Amino acid sequence: MMHSGRVGQRFFLSLPLLTAVSLIAIPAQAEWYVAGQAGYSFAGPLRNVTTTGPFSGIELQDFDLNNSVAYGGKIGAYPFHGSLGFELDVNHSTPHVKSLGDSPGIHLAVTNVGANIVLRYPGVTFQPYLGAGPGIMIARLSRSAETQQDTQVSIGFNFLTGIRAFVTPKVALFTEYKYTGAKFGFHDAFGSFGGFDSTYRAHQLFLGVSYHF
């Protein structure tokens, strides 16, 4: 019998795919958009760092992360040009781990693939909006003096709010705030000694341009 946790994880991992299928199935009367975005990610430290593997259960100090540039893109739709929409949102940042005492820092890259439900005010010129949804968090830890190269995939969540302003009937500029949270498990980071679990949080600010059709 499959463990219920794995069933839940597979379900959430499939949500972006289900969102993509839903976007394809949206009626032709929908308002579609594609967008590019760039900004800055203010990552909090990796908290609740606990070892896994042969020496599991040891609590370590928080791993401070650097702020970094973030960039990505979106595709979404508002069925029947209404207030409720769906979007796929992908963004990438590099919140490298800062130096740990006498040890050098560790390169860390995070890709967030989000499937969001979005609610907007459908104004002609200005459209404030907010949204939320799960995200597939792909985090890659590079080889360093203290760690082995390791990649983890986990489920996180995204909350976003912003406002777009149409400069032409089809082109809009937007600014957006996004909050992201997830559990990261790098279980092979320390090689034969195991790895660690941790909690990731980030605040991100984006500027972007979208094309609506």
Walk through the language-model features, giving the residues of each.
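Cleavable N-terminal export/targeting peptides
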Residues: M1-E31
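Gram-negative (and chloroplast) outer-membrane scaffold detector with strong preference
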Residues: Y71-S144, Y200-F213
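Repeated loop/turn-to-beta-strand initiation elements of outer-membrane beta-barrel proteins
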Residues: W32, G82-F86, T125-F126, A165-L173
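Outer-membrane beta-barrel translocator domains and adjoining extracellular loop/strand segments
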Residues: L46-F55, V97-P104, R140-Q148, G185-F193
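Short glycine/proline- and aromatic-enriched beta-strand/turn motifs that initiate or cap beta-hairpins
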Residues: A28-G82, Q204-F213
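Predominantly the C-terminal beta-signal and adjacent terminal strand-loop region
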Residues: R47, E59, T168-F213
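Transmembrane beta-barrel strands of outer-membrane/channel proteins
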Residues: G36-Y40, L88-H92, L130-I136, I163, ...
